């Protein structure tokens, strides 16, 4: 096992750890989840470019008779990337004291403003930053609004 294989194995472990954390662990952090909203996927083109670049490396590895382990690790990296970018959907978890957005917990007390843009994007203004939340179902914006009014 050379340095490339070790680096690829580390990358795969980190990607799988993120996938498990995002899918299973976040739901149980900071108390009970009262509302869970699916968000629109982002960065599809970036993931496609990443997959194409890895495929180029796989092709190069095969043509120079590189290690089979490296080829398998690269192909597994592509599979995990497909899962993270195209199969898994990002979620917004509303808890008692705040919500998880992009795997970051944000307390309700940090919210200074809330606006809805014309194209259906919820803009939440924090102390020094704005969050642009794009939901997959437009009806979810009403559910978010009702939940925040009732529980804030």
UniProtKB/Swiss-Prot annotation:
Which domain of life, per UniProt? Bacteria
Q: Which GO terms describe its cellular component?
A: plasma membrane
User: What are the record keywords, sorted?
Assistant: Cell inner membrane, Cell membrane, Membrane, Transmembrane, Transmembrane helix
Q: Which compartment or compartments is the protein found in?
A: Cell inner membrane
Transmembrane feature ranges: 6-26, 45-65, 67-87
Keyword set includes NAD: no
- Name the membrane topology term: Multi-pass membrane protein
Report the principal subcellular site: membrane
The cysteines covalently paired via disulfide bonds are none
Q: Please name the HAMAP family in this protein's record.
A: UPF0266 (MF_01071)
Q: Which family does it belong to?
A: Belongs to the UPF0266 family.
> Which NCBIfam families does this entry report, sorted A to Z?
PRK02913.1 (NF002791)
Full protein name: UPF0266 membrane protein plu2700
């Amino acid at each position: 096992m050379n340095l490339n294989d070790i680096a690829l194995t580390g990358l795969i472990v980190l990607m799988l750890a993120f996938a498990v954390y995002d899918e299973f662990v976040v739901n149980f952090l900071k108390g009970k989840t009262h509302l869970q909203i699916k968000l629109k996927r982002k960065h599809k083109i970036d993931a496609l470019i990443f997959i194409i670049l890895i495929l180029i490396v796989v092709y190069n590895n095969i043509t120079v008779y590189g290690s089979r382990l490296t080829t398998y690790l690269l192909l597994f990296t592509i599979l995990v990337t497909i899962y993270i970018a195209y199969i898994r959907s990002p979620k917004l978890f509303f808890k008692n004291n705040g919500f998880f957005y992009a795997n970051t917990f944000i307390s309700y007390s940090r919210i200074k403003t809330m606006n809805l843009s014309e194209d259906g994007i919820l803009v939440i203004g924090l102390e020094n930053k704005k969050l642009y939340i794009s939901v997959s179902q437009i009806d979810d914006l009403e559910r978010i609004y009702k939940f925040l009014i009732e529980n804030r």
